[in-house]
Amino acid sequence: MASFGMNWNQKSPVFWDWENPAPFGPNTMENPKSIPHPEPRGVVVAAANHGSTNSSGGTFTSSSELANGSSKSSLSASFDSSSKLGNSLEFRFASVKGHGKNMCKDGEAGRVEDSGTSPAVAVSHGEPVIGLKLGKRTYFENVCGGQNVKSSSAASGVTCPSTVVKKMKVSQQSTQSSYCQVEGCKVDLSSAREYHRKHKVCEAHSKAPKVIVSGLERRFCQQCSRFHGLAEFDQKKKSCRRRLSDHNARRRKPQQEAISFGSSRLATMFYDARQQTDIYFGQSPFGQVRSNAISSCDNLGGFKFTEAKLPWMKPMKTIGLEDLNFSTLQMPGNVVSHTVHHHDFDGLIPFKGNTPKVLNQGVDPACAVVSSNSNGAPDLRRALSLLSSDSWGPADVQAGSQVHPGGVMPPLAVAAATVTAPTNPVSVMHALHPSTGGGGFWQDGDDPPPLDHASQAQAFMHPGNGSSSGYGHLH
């Protein structure tokens, strides 16, 4: 057994202040009054076996006495090692008693007494005393081996003045009673609702039409939660005029409707707009007249007669009779014809009035022939389709824009006119044989002449400044 002693006052410091890391060293022991004496929060004792493994054992005792003379500590330990148990280290701590006066930050004196006993703790060689597991205190966790560590400590801490001040404020606020701010009202609001306590007004005066606050006649606004002058309120209103106007403006604000392009409402809107401006081919007001097939004249420069289809929402231009100069032939009645598409050909355009005109620009011949019975039923015998197998003679187109008998142009499709009002009569024009008189046209009520030969059609040149839309309108 070997014994040795050491003086802690001459060695490296052991006690540290965790908030002010100023150690107790030899310099601090000389002038203990120059620095405050903090309370030691904890002491960490670490022992490492740096000696020879052949040492049978050892004990050491240490004692320290501070300059203030009020603290004593004693520590005894014995080192035992044997070859049977292996290289192990055993600590035996005796009871440590210390009495001292410690000063806190604010100068208030406190006295701490610690007494504790702990059983022997065996630490195997090679395992660290302090572990690296985060969030756990692993000083002797892995080496206790199921032993119960019992420690008893009693400490009386000193509370800081800041905490005391906060507690005093909370207690004052809880004990302080609030009253209504209306003059003459002494209603205690401690048991009232939080809303009334916050705004310092009782429930009766919050709904009163007129109260006196600070010598002025006021009224409590329900939305502003404060008192306003009586001039800011309307009669029998609990809120001021400004708040009510803002509230009503938000409620009456028109909301913009989002138009869905796939909705039936939008389709109906476009359908109504098209019905007013567009022309429907293939049906009459009575549902009897139907347009027949359309033929083309390949020998006349590639004419192709198709039905006019107006694009949606496209503005149309209507030209009166007084704005244009027309040729000699005029078709009486409201006539709707097919549109002839050929390069710069403007088409057949009826205009406003009772005598719409058929215009042709840039093309000498016109191939529009209208055929129908007097009762409005289509004449299928006289209307030929594109798949017609009838043979026709060679084309002979003269400069006078007339098609002679034996020409190549067959009778073309039927164009039915639809009018805006169902009471107006429907006038259907028919092309006549060259032998018939009367300008080559006949009206409803007359029997249609037989179309044994090719129909005669006369085209008119456009004056040059006409409309270029090529669509028909009825007014």
From Swiss-Prot:
Tissue: Expressed in young panicles.
Keywords, in A-Z order: DNA-binding, Metal-binding, Nucleus, Transcription, Transcription regulation, Zinc, Zinc-finger
GO molecular function: DNA binding; zinc ion binding
Keyword check for Metal-binding: yes
Positions that bind Zn(2+) 1: C180, C185, C202, H205
GO cellular component labels: nucleus
SBP-type zinc finger locations on the chain: 177-254
InterPro entries assigned to the protein according to its UniProt record, in alphabetical order: SBP-like, SBP_dom, SBP_sf
Polar residues biased stretches: 465-475
Motif residue range(s): Bipartite nuclear localization signal: 237-253
Low complexity bias locations: 51-73
Binding, Zn(2+) 2: C221, C224, H228, C240
Localization per record: Nucleus
Residues covered by region (Disordered): 49-73, 437-475
Induction (UniProt): Negatively regulated by microRNAs miR156b and miR156h.
Function description: Trans-acting factor that binds specifically to the consensus nucleotide sequence 5'-TNCGTACAA-3'. May be involved in panicle development.
Record remark on domains: The SBP-type zinc finger is required for the binding to DNA.
Protein name, UniProt field: Squamosa promoter-binding-like protein 12
Species of origin: Oryza sativa subsp. japonica (Rice)
